[in-house]
UniProtKB/Swiss-Prot annotation:
Domain of life per record: Bacteria
Entry's transmembrane regions: none
E.C. no: 2.7.7.6
Binding, Zn(2+) 1: 70, 72, 85, 88
GO cellular component labels: DNA-directed RNA polymerase complex
Cofactor(s) recorded in Swiss-Prot or TrEMBL: Mg(2+); Zn(2+)
Protein name, as recorded: DNA-directed RNA polymerase subunit beta'
Family that this chain belongs to: Belongs to the RNA polymerase beta' chain family.
Function: DNA-dependent RNA polymerase catalyzes the transcription of DNA into RNA using the four ribonucleoside triphosphates as substrates.
Broad class of enzyme this protein falls into: transferase
Species, as recorded: Pseudomonas syringae pv. tomato (strain ATCC BAA-871 / DC3000)
Cofactor detail note: Binds 1 Mg(2+) ion per subunit.
Length: 1399
């Protein structure tokens, strides 16, 4: 028997599984799970509190209430294990079997499962090809349905009401079978022949022409194939047996006072059992049909409520009027099983307390209160005490600890040594929200935190609390030390910059220390070395800010790992020389020879990390902190009312502004300007005045007059406390100082519009009642916004994590040659992000050549580090193709080469890194810093006049990019394409700026010309759209009849006459269909052809076009024939901040999106239909023309006869990402989305690496739509996983069959999360019911590839150290295959053992 137990014990480890399958349960399967039938609705006896027999808590079915004790108490020991008591029928076993044993209820009449009925699209409806309304009428006993028409005229599946049924009975007698209720539905489902139906549908689909019908049929076909493939039978969607949940999962808990708290499920089960028993009785009595029917309907409703309360009709409510929680409610939502218990668990060995500053700690330490440590490390202390022989038993050790004897503290100190603990601060927005530290025991009750890690935790000391967790196992301690230690997390995973940077006091101290003052004590002295400076300063012979000369010895490391020693004399200050003492060897003196503001310090730490490595940097960071604290204390910087110096010019500026406003008011009163103009002008005026005041104030604050050594008065940078705080970046900003010492400025109303009268006072002067009242709006809005923002930002992060959670680095190189083309990011002519920054940490996809030669300077496959970046900049390369997560060809996961550098470590990413989650956290974490509001253009916000020329900022060489142009007689070029760009390159060939050139721009320079800074190189009229000729010839008017299609008008000011084309709706009847045009003819009177085509050169004129040339006039190349006035585009609200990011990631189609050309070809306009214009594009390759109807109000940028390329903008508007993907491909989409998202973050000063956005994009592009199915089993129009399709195509290609063709599809992150391969991950995200219903019907398998699924089933995640565990597990299983015991062998062993034990 012992062997048998061992055998079972070994088989009990269910960890060894690779997939989880979900399906429909057949009645037989439900019975096989069951340990008995629940026949009575009773729960427990009210006197004895023992479970009733055959009731919902029956001990005979579910097992004993107490461990190893039957209900009547006859058997009470472990030795009786497995015995079944003959008196009460209870098996003697552990009480916890009541958590796992299920029961069942035999239903007297079948019941449809509400999930498959009502969860849209209704699965039962699809299979039976009936509408949901009809099926409900049958199920809830309103109509009969014909099951077998026999030889009658009725049809199968036809609905009959009572009257029709009785008529049919009279007419046909028993020749047909029609029933109602779930049994009828079950019969119909049972009768479906899947094979036959699938064959019929596969034939029918290709013969159908209507799109909607094809959609409907292919939906049905998919469902049928799913049923056929999964082995589920359709009739299982109707229940005949109902499983009952184990009682301990729906407990009945006694409260004090003799009352009971019960789970709602018990009420719901009771209802079902009561109705079921009543129905059985009625059937036995053969009661009248109408009563039985009513009871059956009530049973159906009771089961519906149990499975998913409230899905149909009104929810059943309990005694307190709230709806009961059904089985479906148990698993869905934030409080459901998935999110509450499976994904977020509570942890033992943890504690929490308030945090305070630990300025004396080292970076890897934290202060842990003794009381907490004693409690957290209890088991370790017990063990140590016993080992030492200080306590004989655990009990004795416990007593010692409770008494807090002196030995206990010694043991505690020993236990804690080198045992890291994890500190976590909620909300944990990114992985740096949990880090490991070595505990240092402290008195008191607050945890001490190292100041430098505050930035990572986003912590401050105003009452924040943090949690401590103890890693127990050796492996956990190892991971905590090697991966999570605060000293290993110097760089931020979001952008690779240091996150351990000093802030506030430390910055102020270092800044104060490195400032210089004129005529300070000891100015002009020369020192032999740093030690001498130190001695003189300590002796008080030289002031901290004195300008001195010092001889220094420095060791400078170069990039190749070598180092150079040199000695030189530098001009510096005493403070900087003192600071250089803590700088590690290898860095040059120049890094500290400047006022150390926040940015400079950050740069210093970054440089230190790259040059001398991690260990030195950590020591250096600590030294910086200690130094900073020391000197900020010495500086005595504080703040007093006299620091707010109000500028003298303030009154004058405000008076002048008030005068101007009065002037505008009087103009408005006399009707010269409109209300809107007045409002805008006034607001402009005040914002200008405000800027002037703050300028005057800052120049006042930032300078002070002092007398130098020679007795001359000079200006030096001010030592005003407030100015120093703002200037160093320690606290405050110019905007805040402006409110304290300048003027508060314009305020916004609650609706976001700006109030015309500004607050002219500042806080030092004090606000009047009205001014205070106006300013309360803003303050209140700020708080409300913050609360909303936090919730929204959290939800965005959750969606991002969900879509990217299964993306892990799984291999080193996928071997792809594709990538993204990287160019410098240029905005409005300025280079916002140079190429070097964008390619840093990426792998080059294709060889980079020296410009103008064939010489390879960066070979493909190079990981670009700082050294290579300098090299690329030096050689003035302006475009590089780099590997990207989007183009990676790894099947499951991503490869290390396509991802590139692990930003937080600075080397190539390791296999097993969960890059998806890191990307999601990096994008989501700064979400709370983004603004919520949408910016209105108008008022003082961002108002720019339309650009009408290009004025270069830097001198250099002109480069023209894909610009089609013609040359005018005077040598100027005229742009005749829309996408042309003009760039200026410096002497090294590096691009410094780039501008877009609109159609019709006159360019006064040529490719390769040298220009000076500030010169204007191109001009155009922003308010009209010209039509430019591309050849010379004679103008001939076509269809231009005065009064019918055109009208002449004379300009009063200039006396010039213009011809204006009339709008079609203003023309008389004769002119409705005439299309006025200007035609070009040669000297011989023949039509000229457009260059390179056989299309006659005639320019059709749209409505309102102004023609500037006379009939028969000679014109030259590049002349303007006509101008189309452009209304200034409507000012759209620019959605900014968080909503914009969410829109982009959700891939929402914008309202009134821009219209792009679907094909490359020539534009023509067809016949107009009501309110719409017909645009026809004739492709150049001679394929069929493409037609599109465009609303008349859309302003088009193109005219007849013009050439467009696929994807070019025809009508302006916000871009639709789906169009970009369809017409321009994946890389154009990537460029668009990355730039758009970066723009939002850049506005807030947040840096995020592009690759994180690309990583999320990869997940959004997982799906494809089948365009042609070829020989595959796919159906046209299906959405499939890209990897599936590629695998299938490879298989077909190998067999020389036709492969399927597909187009890429962009899904929003929510949709992408729900359509993932893993149903566990999707169900735990959103729409749990729908996901599970779909998965069950199709019998889906979840291969547990992602992180989330593995957390839910309770295994290590397949990332990081868990990846190694999983691959090792698989390897071991391959080796151990033969030794595994099959189920049949276990059964044989069991019977044998039982037989032998029986004898």
């Amino acid at each position: 028997m012992k062997d048998l137990l061992n055998l079972l014990k070994n088989q009990g480890q269910v960890e060894e599984f690779d997939a989880i399958r979900i399906g429909l349960a057949s009645p037989e399967m439900i019975r096989s799970w069951s340990f008995g039938e629940v026949k009575k609705p009773e729960t427990i006896n009210y006197r004895t509190f023992k479970p009733e027999r055959d009731g919902l808590f029956c001990a005979k079915i579910f097992g004993p209430v107490k461990d190893y004790e039957c209900l009547c108490g006859k058997y009470k020991r472990l030795k009786h294990r497995g015995v079944i008591c003959e008196k009460c029928g209870v098996e003697v076993a552990l009480a916890k079997v009541r958590r796992e044993r299920m029961a069942h209820i035999e239903l007297a009449s079948p019941v449809a499962h509400i999930w498959f009925l009502k969860s849209l699209p209704s699965r039962i409806g699809l299979l039976m090809d009936m509408t949901l309304r009809d099926i409900e009428r049958v199920l809830y006993f309103e109509s009969y349905v014909v099951i077998d028409p026999g030889m009658t005229t009725l049809e199968k599946g036809q609905l009959l009401n009572d009257e029709q049924y009785f008529e049919a009975l009279e007419e046909f007698g028993d020749d047909f079978d029609a029933r109602m209720g779930a049994e009828a539905v079950r019969e119909l489902l049972h009768a479906i022949d899947l094979e036959h139906e699938i064959g019929r549908l596969r034939e029918e689909i290709p013969q159908t022409n209507s799109e909607t019908k094809i959609k409907k049929l292919s939906k049905r076909l998919k469902l049928m194939e799913a049923f056929q493939g999964s082995g589920n039978l359709p009739e299982w969607m109707v229940l005949t047996v109902l499983p009952v949940l184990p009682p301990d999962l729906r407990p009945l808990v006694p409260l004090d006072g003799g009352r009971f708290a019960t789970s709602d499920l018990n009420d719901l089960y009771r209802r079902v059992i009561n109705r079921n028993n009543r129905l059985k009785r009625l059937l036995d009595l053969s009661a009248p049909d109408i009563i039985v029917r009513n009871e059956k309907r009530m049973l159906q409703e009771a089961v519906d409520a149990l499975l998913d309360n409230g899905r149909r009709g009104r929810a059943i409510t309990g005694s307190n009027k709230r709806p009961l929680k059904s089985l479906a409610d148990m698993i869905k939502g934030k409080q459901g099983r998935f999110r509450q218990n499976l994904l977020g668990k509570r942890v033992d060995y943890s504690g929490r307390s308030v945090i305070t500053v630990g300025p004396t700690l080292r970076l890897h330490q934290c202060g842990l209160p003794k009381k907490m440590a004693l409690e957290l490390f209890k088991p370790f202390i017990f063990g140590k005490l016993e080992m030492r022989g200080l306590a004989t038993t655990i009990k004795a050790a416990k007593k010692m600890v409770e008494r807090e004897l002196p030995e206990v503290w010694d043991v505690l100190a020993e236990v804690i040594r080198e045992h890291p603990v994890l500190l976590n601060r909620a909300p944990t927005l990114h992985r740096l929200g949990i880090q490991a530290f070595e505990p240092v025991l402290i008195e008191g009750k607050a945890i001490q935190l190292h100041p430098l890690v505050c930035a990572a935790y986003n912590a401050d000391f105003d009452g924040d609390q943090m949690a401590v967790h103890v890693p127990l196992t050796l492996e956990a301690q190892l991971e905590a030390r090697a991966l999570m230690m605060s000293t290993n997390n110097i760089l931020s995973p979001a952008n690779g910059e240091p996150i351990i940077v000093p802030s506030q006091d430390v910055v102020l101290g270092l800044y104060y220390m490195t400032r210089e003052a004129i005529n300070a004590k000891g100015e002009g002295r020369v020192f032999a070395d740093l030690q001498e400076v130190d001695r003189v300063f300590r002796a008080g012979e030289a002031a901290l800010h004195a300008k001195v000369k010092v001889r220094i010895h420095e060791t400078v490391n170069d990039r190749d790992g070598g180092s150079v020693k040199n000695t030189r004399i530098v001009d510096t200050t005493v403070g900087r020389a003192l600071l250089f003492q803590v700088v590690p060897a290898g860095l040059s003196y120049d890094v500290v020879n400047q006022p150390m503001k926040k940015k400079a310090i950050s740069k210093l730490i970054n440089q230190c990390y790259r040059v001398v490595g991690l260990k030195e940097t950590v020591i250096f960071a600590d030294q910086l902190m200690y130094t900073g604290f020391a000197y900020s204390t010495i500086s005595g910087v504080s703040i007093g009312v006299n620091d707010f110096v109000i500028p003298d010019e303030k009154a004058r500026i405000i008076d002048a502004a008030t005068e101007e406003v009065k002037e505008i008011e009087s103009q408005y009163a006399s009707g010269l300007v409109t209300q809107g103009e007045k409002y805008n002008k006034v607001i402009d005026l005040w914002s200008k005045a405000n800027d002037e005041v703050s300028k005057a104030m800052m120049s006042n604050l930032s300078k002070e007059r002092v007398i130098d050594r020679h007795g001359v008065e000079v200006d030096q940078e001010s030592f005003n406390s407030m100015y120093m705080m703002a200037d160093s970046g320690a606290r405050g900003s110019a905007a805040q100082i402006r409110q304290l010492a300048g003027m508060r400025g314009l305020m916004a109303k609650p609706d976001g519009s700006i109030i015309e009268t500004p607050i002219t006072a500042n806080f030092r002067e004090g606000l009047s009642v009205l001014q205070y009242f106006i300013s309360t709006h803003g303050a209140r809005k700020g708080l409300a916004d913050t609360a909303l923002k936090t919730a929204n930002s959290g939800y965005l992060t959750r969606r991002l994590v969900d879509v990217a959670q299964d993306l892990v680095v799984t291999e080193v190189d996928c071997g792809t040659e594709h990538g993204l083309l990287m160019t410098p990011h240029i905005e409005g002519g300025d280079v916002v992000e140079p190429l070097g920054e964008r390619v840093l940490g990426r792998v080059i996809a294709r060889d980079v050549f020296k410009p103008g030669t064939e010489e390879i300077i960066v070979p493909a496959g190079t990981l670009v580090d700082e050294k290579w970046v300098e090299f690329i900049e030096l050689n003035s390369i302006d475009e590089v193709i780099v590997r990207s997560p989007i183009s990676c060809e790894t099947r499951y996961g991503i490869c290390a080469k396509c991802y590139g550098r692990d930003l937080a470590r600075g080397h190539q990413v390791n296999i097993g890194e969960a890059v998806g989650v890191i990307a999601a956290q990096s994008i989501g974490e700064p979400g709370t810093q983004l603004t919520m509001r949408t910016f209105h253009i108008g008022g003082a916000a961002s108002r720019t006049s339309a650009a009408d020329s290009v004025q270069v900022k830097n001198g250099g060489t002109v480069r023209l990019h894909n610009l089609k142009h013609v040359e005018r007689v005077d040598g100027h070029l005229v742009a005749v394409s829309r996408s042309g760009e003009l760039a200026i390159a410096d002497d090294f060939g590096r691009e410094r700026e780039r501008y877009k050139l609109p159609y019709g721009a006159v360019i006064s320079v040529k490719e390769g010309d040298k220009v000076d800074a500030g010169s204007i190189v191109a001009k155009w009229d922003p308010h009209t759209h010209p039509i430019v000729t591309e050849m010379k010839g004679t103008v001939t008017y076509v269809g231009m009849e005065e009064g019918i299609t055109i009208k002449r008008q004379t300009d009063e000011l200039t006396g010039m006459t213009n011809i204006e084309v009339l709008d079609a709706k203003d023309r008389p009847a004769a002119g409705k269909d005439i299309r006025p045009a200007v035609k070009m003819v040669g000297l011989d009177g023949k039509d000229l052809l457009l260059p390179g085509t056989d299309v006659p050169a005639q320019y059709f004129l749209p409505a309102n076009a102004l023609v500037g040339v006379a009939d028969g006039a000679q014109i030259a190349i590049g002349d303007v024939i006509a101008r189309i006035p452009q209304e200034t585009s409507k000012t759209r609200d620019i959605t900014g901040g968080l909503p914009r990011v969410a829109d982009l990631f959700e891939a929402r189609r914008p309202k009134e999106a821009s219209i792009l050309a679907e094909v490359s070809g020539t534009i023509a306009f067809g016949k107009e239909t009501k309110g719409k214009r017909r645009l026809v594009i004739t492709p150049n390759d001679g394929s069929d023309p493409y037609e599109e109807l465009i609303p008349k109000w859309r302003h088009l940028n193109v005219f007849e006869g013009e050439q467009v390329n696929r994807g070019e903008v025809i009508s302006d508007g916000p871009s639709d990402p789906h169009d970009i993907l369809r017409l321009l491909g994946v890389s154009a989409l990537a460029k668009y989305i990355v730039n758009e998202i970066q723009d939002v973050y850049r506005l807030q000063g947040v840096k995020i690496n592009d690759k994180h956005i690309e990583t999320i994009l990869r997940q959004m592009l997982r799906k494809v739509e089948i365009a042609e199915s070829g020989d595959s089993s796919f159906i046209k129009g299906d959405q499939m996983e890209l990897t599936h399709v590629l695998v299938e195509n490879e298989r077909l290609g190998a067999d020389d069959k036709f492969v399927s063709k597909f187009t890429r599809v962009l899904l929003g992150i929510t949709k992408a999360s729900l359509s993932t391969e893993s149903f566990i991950s999707a169900a735990s995200f959103q729409e749990t019911t729908r996901v599970l219903t779909e998965a069950a019907v199709t019998g889906k398998r979840d291969y547990l590839r992602g992180l989330k699924e593995n957390v839910v089933v309770g295994r290590l995640i397949p990332a990081g150290t868990g990846l190694a565990y999983h691959s090792e597990r698989k390897r071991r299983r391959e080796m151990d295959k033969p030794t595994r015991v099959s189920a049949s062998e276990v059964e044989a062993a069991l019977t044998e053992a039982l037989n032998s034990s029986g004898n």
